[in-house]
């Protein structure tokens, strides 16, 4: 190899190395910005606190701390499998399946529950979900009671409805009886908004649960 060819070869190698380092640095910066991506087949879990004081939750070594009253954490990913979940002062065994989403719910005076959250993949519409953890059959309607949105959701079950993005005023009904008017909620494309209903008898507590908005 003559000196000129050797020089060109080293120049190309140096350029390739510098580009590789730059690409690695860009990926590192992107990782720092967006956080680690979930490995394929992960399970996802969040916490909803139906109580009146802050709540700490853990699943295995994954922590969901300082969950505000009537608030929720964001989802965190972890390997699928069997774990012990610690919800405040109570614990329960949980089994998390691959590519599945769950909410750990803490209820005042009751045992914590693991609630499955079927994933939603329609990016053009929003999904309204009623997670009914009460003992009554419930219906989500427009605030005037004239139109059913999610009808006849049985105790300890959920009901879904895909709708166009909109800001709406809704109410929860037990048969023809209005249980509660709900806070106005804005539904965005590709978003799942859950109405969690806890409590029993005449003391039902419906609360909208959305993924927290992250600050820039």
Curated annotation (Swiss-Prot):
A Pfam match is: AlgF
Chief subcellular location equals: periplasm
GO cellular component, as recorded: periplasmic space
Keywords assigned: Alginate biosynthesis, Periplasm, Signal
Which GO biological process categories is it annotated with? alginic acid acetylation; alginic acid biosynthetic process
What InterPro entries is this protein classified in? AlgF
* Source organism, top-level taxon: Bacteria
Give the signal peptide range: 1-28
Instruction: Give the protein family.
Output: Belongs to the AlgF family.
State its role.
Together with AlgI and AlgJ, forms an inner membrane complex which probably interacts with the alginate polymerization-transport complex and adds acetyl groups at the O-2 and O-3 positions of mannuronate residues. Acetylation of alginate is important for the architecture of biofilms and increases resistance to opsonic killing in the host.
Q: What is this protein called?
A: Alginate biosynthesis protein AlgF
- The scientific name of the source species is Pseudomonas aeruginosa (strain ATCC 15692 / DSM 22644 / CIP 104116 / JCM 14847 / LMG 12228 / 1C / PRS 101 / PAO1)
